[in-house]
Each structure stands twice: as C-alpha cells, then as structure tokens.
Amino acid sequence: RLMETAAKQLEPEGYFKEDVGAFWEILETRPYMRVCYTYFDALISCGMMHRAIGEGQRLLELCENDNLGVRYQLMHLYAYMEDEMHALALHKQFDSYEETQMLLPLAVLYYKLNQFDKAEDYIKRLSAANKDAKKFLRAAAQERLEDYFDQLNPFGYQPFTMEELLEELMKSSYLFDSVPYFFAWANSCLRAQTTAKKKAAGKAGSNKKL
C-alpha cells in the first residue's frame, strides 16, 4: 500500500511517463525508489525470489544508473535460480565490469550448473579483481571468517576488499547457503593455480641456469 500511495502521488506530475530511467536523479522520486528497494529487500527475506527478481528488474528500469546497487542483489538472485541467460545479460548491461559482486555469484552460478571450467574462470577473475579474494576463500573454506567480521566498518565497505566480500556473504546468504561445498572447491582451484605458477617459475629458473 505504501508503494501504491507513493506512486499515485507521482503520477499526476508525469514522472512515470517522462523520467523513467532517471528516477534517482530527481529528488522528488528518490523516496519512491527507497520504498521500492525496501520492498525488494523484504521479498528476498521472505524467500519470494521470483517476485524479488521482477521488482529488481523494475527498479533497474526506473533507474538505469543503478545508484542503489540493485544489480548486485539481482545477480545473486539469478545465480540462485540458475538463470544463466539473465545473469549474463545483466553483466553485459553494466559493461561486463569486473566487480566483486558480479564475479562471485557468476562463479556460483556455473558451479551450480556443473560447468566447473567456467566457474573456475570467474574465480580467477575474482582473484585478479579483488586483492583479498584468496584470503577470503581460504578463510571460508576453513570456516574462519569470524576472524574478519570484527574488521567490518558499520558505515560501509571499501570496494575490492575483504570487507566487500563479507558484506556480500551476509546480504546474499541465501545463495551461499545453497552451495555448502562451493568455498572449499573455489579455494582448491586457486591453490592449484598457485602451485602451477610456482612450478612454472621453477622450470623457468632452471632453464636460465642451463
């Protein structure tokens, strides 16, 4: 009802006809966006994932720049629902930017789809984009993440850090709870990559000596 009331107040001004796509840029429509985001978040908390996806998509239509970060939660929802087509389209919509909260759910998506090569590729891309990804995955695999939660800033997180990964884990727990062995698998992928690099470096050093 709150959303309906807020929408009725905006309709006479023509915002839904003239300003769709730029709702966050207009001060008069920002409160409506906040109400809709709260509803979006509540749908997820209630486990109404299909309805949450629909509301998330609508929010992105109203605000194409996504100032509220709806795309991140929407990506986790697509991964949860194993919706590869919409997940890839969403990533492309935002220029396929290598962001923590895009790459990790995409890795989970392909893990759930049993496409481990693609999942591993996204894990490696995550590791390249976020300097703390290896540390995070190792701690998650060893069930030691509690050691880092005290470091969280209550006023927000710094992108591409452990803080962002922990924030993501808490906000999208429904996804990560659905794949209890994912972190152990992802950590083993990065360990294998590190071992391979060390062996390659060792061989290169031996060849130089010869």
Regions found by a protein language model. Name each.
Residues 1-8, 60-66, 92-98, 110-135:
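TPR/TPR-like (Sel1-like) alpha-helical repeat modules
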Residues 42, 75-77, 109-110:
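Residue-level signature for tetratricopeptide repeat
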Residues 1-29, 59-62:
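Flexible helix-coil transition and linker loops at the boundaries of alpha-helical arrays
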Residues 106-210:
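Long, ordered, amphipathic alpha-helical scaffolds
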